[in-house]
Amino acid sequence: MPFRSNNPITRDELLSRFFPQFHPVTTFNSGLSGGSFLIEHQGQRFVVRQPHDPDAPQSAFLRQYRALSQLPASIAPKPHLYLRDWMVVDYLPGAVKTYLPDTNELAGLLYYLHQQPRFGWRITLLPLLELYWQQSDPARRTVGWLRMLKRLRKAREPRPLRLSPLHMDVHAGNLVHSASGLKLIDWEYAGDGDIALELAAVWVENTEQHRQLVNDYATRAKIYPAQLWRQVRRWFPWLLMLKAGWFEYRWRQIGDQQFIRLADDTWRQLLIKQ
């Protein structure tokens, strides 16, 4: 149920107007992320979400709602309400673990997602890379960063192997191990793109695990594993630049030192993978 309003409302106004019988749950269970809280009424639970990035355009939050509206409930939470700065979705009961599931199980989830109808908007990385450069701390901008940005701009993004709907933020903290199988939360970066881009973006523990995930996916997708791995590798510089730039952007935005550490670590990875 989309609800359009140009006037932002508070949390209390949201609950009293749309969910008067619900109350916030003070003890949060697994499956929630930053900027979310849980409400409950007679055993029914919803997650109330706000945009993670307060500076992002409103259209990005609306796209997340639209993506959830067309995805099957077997892999994503069903949305119930959207309005400016707020979204209410189903709570997914289950465990959120600190490590990825078996690569074959994860490959099955991603392959199923990639068989769904496309969302209708493309993921393009270059505008994001340039935005993060422009919005980063000037003291953190380096000649090397600018050189790599120009190199990618000249090379252009790899041609998609297969174009599908992507989640684009697959890591252990966004996977809910439910009684009915794996499900994904936090769809804020979802869009249409290359399946190899999704596989390249998974937050794996090591190269061996990454290769096995790609091999398991290739088996399901009937693609030669070596061909798929080559395409995944083409996306590595783009993904590492995206991560590094995002960490730099978030550092300037909120000043949390963890983002400097994450950015520095990603820059080191980028130099290794060149």
Curated annotation (Swiss-Prot):
<dbReference type="GO" id="GO:0005524">
    <property type="term" value="F:ATP binding"/>
</dbReference>
<dbReference type="GO" id="GO:0006772">
    <property type="term" value="P:thiamine metabolic process"/>
</dbReference>
<protein>
    <recommendedName>
        <fullName>Thiamine kinase</fullName>
        <ecNumber>2.7.1.89</ecNumber>
    </recommendedName>
</protein>
<keyword id="KW-0067">ATP-binding</keyword>
<keyword id="KW-0418">Kinase</keyword>
<dbReference type="InterPro" id="IPR011009">
    <property type="entry name" value="Kinase-like_dom_sf"/>
</dbReference>
<keyword id="KW-0808">Transferase</keyword>
<dbReference type="GO" id="GO:0019165">
    <property type="term" value="F:thiamine kinase activity"/>
</dbReference>
<comment type="function">
    <text>Catalyzes the ATP-dependent phosphorylation of thiamine to thiamine phosphate. Is involved in thiamine salvage.</text>
</comment>
<dbReference type="GO" id="GO:0009229">
    <property type="term" value="P:thiamine diphosphate biosynthetic process"/>
</dbReference>
<dbReference type="InterPro" id="IPR002575">
    <property type="entry name" value="Aminoglycoside_PTrfase"/>
</dbReference>
<dbReference type="Pfam" id="PF01636">
    <property type="entry name" value="APH"/>
</dbReference>
<comment type="pathway">
    <text>Cofactor biosynthesis; thiamine diphosphate biosynthesis; thiamine phosphate from thiamine: step 1/1.</text>
</comment>
<keyword id="KW-0547">Nucleotide-binding</keyword>
<dbReference type="InterPro" id="IPR014093">
    <property type="entry name" value="Thiamine_kinase"/>
</dbReference>
<comment type="similarity">
    <text>Belongs to the thiamine kinase family.</text>
</comment>
